[in-house]
């Protein structure tokens, strides 16, 4: 691995940033996967399964906030929209 930085501290910062970027990508990916699973469940699954997948998506969002990957307001907005989708599909039927 070739580092462009000159000083020892700059090289260390690059390594730290790479490590954090990998961690953040993994967490973001987990959030996106949970949301996609929930949205697929809205179309085909019964309400109980969709509700459980909604819980998992909310949990993934909360974990991402705790780890500082996404802002709490962003997570709140996403949770609100997911809950609204759930209610519109299952309260109507």
UniProtKB/Swiss-Prot annotation:
Q: Which InterPro entries match?
A: Ribosomal_bS20, Ribosomal_bS20_sf
What UniProt keywords are attached to this protein's entry? Ribonucleoprotein, Ribosomal protein, RNA-binding, rRNA-binding
Quick one: where's region Disordered? 72-93
For bias type Basic residues, the affected ranges are 74-84
Disulfide bond entries:
none
The lineage's top-level taxon is Bacteria
Example GO molecular function term? structural constituent of ribosome
Any one Gene Ontology BP term: translation
The record's Gene Ontology cellular component field reads:
cytosol; small ribosomal subunit
Protein family membership: Belongs to the bacterial ribosomal protein bS20 family.
Entry function: Binds directly to 16S ribosomal RNA.
The name on file for this protein is: Small ribosomal subunit protein bS20
Q: Which organism is it from?
A: Carboxydothermus hydrogenoformans (strain ATCC BAA-161 / DSM 6008 / Z-2901)
Its gene name is rpsT
């Amino acid at each position: 691995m070739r580092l462009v930085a000159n000083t020892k501290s700059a090289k260390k910062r690059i390594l730290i940033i790479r490590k954090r970027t990998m961690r953040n990508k993994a967490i973001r990916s987990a959030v996106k996967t949970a949301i996609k699973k929930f949205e697929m469940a809205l179309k085909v699954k019964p309400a109980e399964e969709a509700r459980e997948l909604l819980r998992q998506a909310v949990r993934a969002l909360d974990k991402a906030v705790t780890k500082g990957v996404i802002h709490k307001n962003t997570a709140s907005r996403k949770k609100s929209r997911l809950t609204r989708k759930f209610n519109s599909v299952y309260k109507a039927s």
